[in-house]
Structure formats: C-alpha cells, structure tokens
Amino acid sequence: MSASHFAKQDSAPVNPHGTGRLSRREFLAASGALLALACTGSLGAGQAHAGTRYASFASESSEPTPTLSDETYRRVSFSAVGDNLMNYPVVEAADANAGTTGDGWFDFTPMYQGVGDIVSSHDLNFIDIETILGGDDLGLSGYPVFNSPSCLAEQITGYGWNLCTTATNHTLDMGLTGILNSCATWAAQTNMLMTGSFSSQEDRDRIRTCERNGMTFAFLSYADDFNGIPIPSEAPWCVAQAGDDAMTSDVTRAKEVADVVIVAMSWGSEYEHSPNDLQRHYAQHLANLGVDLIVGFGPHVIQPIEWYYGYDNDGNPTGTSTLVVFSLGNFLSNQPYSYANVEGCFTCEFERLGTKGRATITNLAWTPLVNHISSGWHQVFKLKDYTDDLAATHESIGLESDPRGYCYNLTQQVIGPSGVYIDW
C-alpha cells in the first residue's frame, strides 16, 4: 500500500424540454423517485480491450440488468460540482485529518460530507479534478504548479463520484510524466469514468460511455488554456484542447454510440461572473453539434445557466437545444476571496420514453454551496445548513457585513435569472 494512501482508517429562459422551475416539494419528490442503476462493461476509465474505440465502466451492483421495452419510461439523475482545487492548505488539512502529520497519509473525505446526500442519491455524479495527480514520487506541490496526492482518486471514487475530468489549466503542471501517472491512477478506479487527459493516441480516440437505466451516456471534456505550458510535441494526444475541429469529430463519434452527450469545459475568465466571448462561441458550436449538456468550470466563481439552440451550417434551426451550466464555481479550495467560496451543485434528470427520440432534461436545480475556510478547517457546506455563526468565522466571507446574506445575494444575482429551482 502506498504511503500516501488515505487515512488510517469536499427574464428566465424557458426549458424547451420540460419543467424549468419546480416547487421544492416537486423537486424532492422527483429526485427521490430514482430508478435502479445498470452499467455495462468492466473497464476502468482510460482502459479498453484492444481494438475498441470506446471505454466504459461497470456498476458495483451484481444485479442483472432489467429488460427494458420500447415503451419503458427511463429516468437518470445527474449531479455536478466544480473545482476540486488542491491548494496546499487543503492538503495540509487532509494530512491533519489522517492523524499524525507528515507521515504521508491524507484524508479528504470529511471535507466533502456536506454534499454526501446529493452524491448518494444521484445516478451520475460529476466532479472537476482541477489539479493533477501526477505521482507522489514527483513531490507534492500547491499553487502555482500543482501536484496533488494520488490517494484523492480512491477517496473521490469511494465517496460516490463516478464522472470526472482532468482537462484543466493545470493538466500539464507535471508534464507528460505527470499525465501518464494520473491516467494510470484513475484507470485503477473501476467505478470512475475519467476523460480529458490520455495515455496514448488510442486512448485519446476512445469515447467514454456508461449506461444507466437503459440510456447510454457519452462523456467528453476539453480545456481552452494550460497556463502557457505547451502540449508536448511528442504527445499531442495527451490532453483534450478545446477547438471546433476536435469537438466536431468527437461529438460526431459520441452521438453514434450514445443517447446523451455530456461535455465538461474548462474555460472562462478568472473571477468573472459573466461568460466571455470564447465561452459563448464554444457553447454555440457544441449546441450546433447536438450536445445535450455542457458543465463548465474554471473561472473559480459561479456563472449563469442558459439554454442554447442548435443551427445547421446554413443557419437553419435544427430543433435541438443544449443546456449550458457556464461555471459551477470552486468546490474545495483555499482561495482567499469571498466570491470564490460561493459555489453550487447542479442537478437534473434525463428522461426518455422508449428507445427512440432525444432524452429530455428536467428537474433542473441548483443547491448553493459554501467552501468553508477557518483556522485550518476546510469543508463544503450547503448554504441552507450554513449558520450565521459559522459564516462569521469564514476567513473571507466572515469579513462581509452580512456573511450569510452575501452568499445568498450572490447566488440570487448570478443563478436566479436562470430560472432553475434554487434549493435554499
């Protein structure tokens, strides 16, 4: 067992597919009506049998997959959180959580307990792995060139996240060696579907898919910037760089094998609550390609949720629409700005009757989160569980005149106009 293993014992647009705003009672009832999971394949992220272009992962359940008829109603629930950003104070706190400090053991799991019920109650759970797990033997490091403990992969997967991206502006922080180490680390997690960085051209060409309740999901990811670090010339395949041509090729292949295509995007201007022109360009391009959902991150702050409509090359409407969550904000981090610690968890459901036609996205909701930082204590809380007394102790939010009110007002200002249900 590695010495870095975890502890010895983180006006509103109308939804063209369905209901955009629900009462809390309706939303919770819908979220509670989760159907059994069914997952195909036995391969870890980044692994596949020789010759295949697709990678998938298996469910922990040994129950047989139920037979679904063409008239079966299918529903799959989804959640997404933002940047798992391993600033070194967060790593030091995980070291302390594990017991004796400096012994190479880390426990990040207490930091995530505020969202445990969300993760456990949804079929697909996405998290952005903002900083590379480049291999502990390269030395752990924080800002500005990160290398995070490899045990994070096991702890995050064990906590219930099963979709992650490693395509961020920090992917190249440890060079090609770090990427190859990261790919091997994530490939060992059999219930995690990772994409965004790759171990070979063959690996880059594989479309990651998983099946839930009779629907097949494809998962793609891109980053638009690597902090000025060039992609290694000998390994142009090692990370998915955003670009119209690459996206067109990947989405076209993904739609051949999946009912739903989800794209994760590392993009945006740092600390800006409004999407920039490049974000909007890529959102429209992906909408034109027929992507179902885009989940964004990178600015370290929350940004709006909007619907985009698809058009063909002649400018004619295709009749499809794409939901764009421009930025989920940070998730777990140590950034010293109030606005960088107000974040969210986006949830929705994918629904379809039978095997034909496009899945619809329903029951859109946003659970406001706060990344709490206080005297070495790091933990994510739901805003509705975040008391005034606790908010007053936050190292940055606590300096606001009304700490908890600040979190509420910022969420309302940015997410409120989107028209999604906010779970206050």
Where are these regions (language model features)?
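Acidic, metal/ion-coordinating pockets
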Residues: 51-424
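N-terminal secretory signal peptides
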Residues: 1-22, 30-41, 49
